[in-house]
Amino acid sequence: MEHMFPENQIENLFVGWIKKHIRNGNLTLFEEFFKTDPWIVNRCDKNGSSVFMWICIYGRIDFLKFLFKQESYPGEIINPHRRDKDGNSALHYLAEKKNHLILEEVLGYFGKNGTRICLPNFNGITPVMKAAMRGRSLNMLSLIKFGADPTQKDYHRGFTAWDWAVFTGNMELVKSLNHDYQKPLYMHFPLYKLDVFHRWFKKKPKIIITGCKNNVYEKLPEQNPNFLCVKKLNKYGK
């Protein structure tokens, strides 16, 4: 008697096989499968991650450029809003990556079609929050440029992207957003006034939160090594 596999198991095995070829950069094989079945990009594994998501996760910009040339208009075949079992879209994964050029490529392409940049996962975490958690300042800037709202709050803590940057201790990100990019971004973050200084008995500078609403102080963990939260400082920063 012929052994029959459940349909979902066959789907998982197939996507897993395609995923390996994406990871290895086998674009020629992928092109052949795409020509046979363009909807392959939306097929998912057992975790709900689509083939398009895995292309983004592995950072295969050559695969992306191939796909974008196949569509008559953005979103004709590729569904950028498809989410995995945790509610994450491809943009959530791209926001965490170091190479912001891949994120720019996707945003620049789907931005023509009004892609929802602020789509949250099931915990209310948006792509720009993911970028803040990982300290990806260029990714944050790209997402905001294409319409992401850095003041949107998650469902559990009520944190914005800026709160997450401070909470996770990404000192360089906070410094960068407040100083290097002060003009375009400071309007989004009115609760904080930041001063950076070197303490003689510390190797690294501290970021001092010197001006914000009282309820924000409760969000900052005391054990965070990069941030101190005080209401008043003397001229020596103590």
From Swiss-Prot:
Q: Where is this motif: PxIxITxC motif?
A: 205-212
For the motif Nuclear localization signal, what are the positions?
A: 80-86, 202-213
Check the record and name the InterPro entries matching this protein: Ankyrin_rpt, Ankyrin_rpt-contain_sf
How does it get modified post-translation?
A: The protein exists in a 28 kDa and a 32 kDa form, probably due to post-translational modifications which are neither phosphorylation, nor sumoylation.
List cellular component terms (GO).
Answer: host cell cytoplasm; host cell nucleus
**GO terms, biological process:** symbiont-mediated suppression of host NF-kappaB cascade
Report the main location listed first in the record. host cell
Compartment annotation: Host nucleus; Host cytoplasm
Q: Does the keyword Ubl conjugation apply?
A: yes
Please name the Pfam families in this protein's record.
Ank_2
Top-rank lineage group of the source organism: Viruses
Q: Where is this motif: FLCV motif?
A: 227-230
Q: Which UniProt keywords apply?
A: ANK repeat, Early protein, Host cytoplasm, Host nucleus, Host-virus interaction, Inhibition of host NF-kappa-B by virus, Repeat, Ubl conjugation
Q: What does this protein do?
A: IkB-like protein that inhibits the binding of NF-kappa-B to DNA, thereby downregulating pro-inflammatory cytokine production. Forms a heterodimer with the NF-kappa-B subunit RELA/p65 and prevents the activation of the NF-kappa-B transcription factor. Inhibits calcineurin function, which is required for the induction of nuclear factor of activated T cells (NFAT)-dependent immune response genes. Prevents the binding of substrates to calcineurin without affecting the phosphatase activity.
Q: Which family does it belong to?
A: Belongs to the asfivirus A238L family.
Q: What is known of its domains?
A: The C-terminal region contains the docking motifs PxIxITxC and FLCV, which are required and sufficient for binding to host calcineurin.
Q: How does it assemble?
A: Interacts with host PPIA. Interacts with host PPP3CA/Calcineurin. Interacts with host RELA/p65; interaction of the 32 kDa form with host RELA results in the formation of a stable complex with NF-kappa-B. Interacts with host PPP3R1. Interacts with host EP300; this interaction inhibits the association of host EP300 with host RELA, JUN and NFATC2.
Annotated PANTHER family: ANKYRIN REPEAT AND PROTEIN KINASE DOMAIN-CONTAINING PROTEIN, ANKYRIN REPEAT-CONTAINING PROTEIN-RELATED
Supply the name of the protein. IkB-like protein
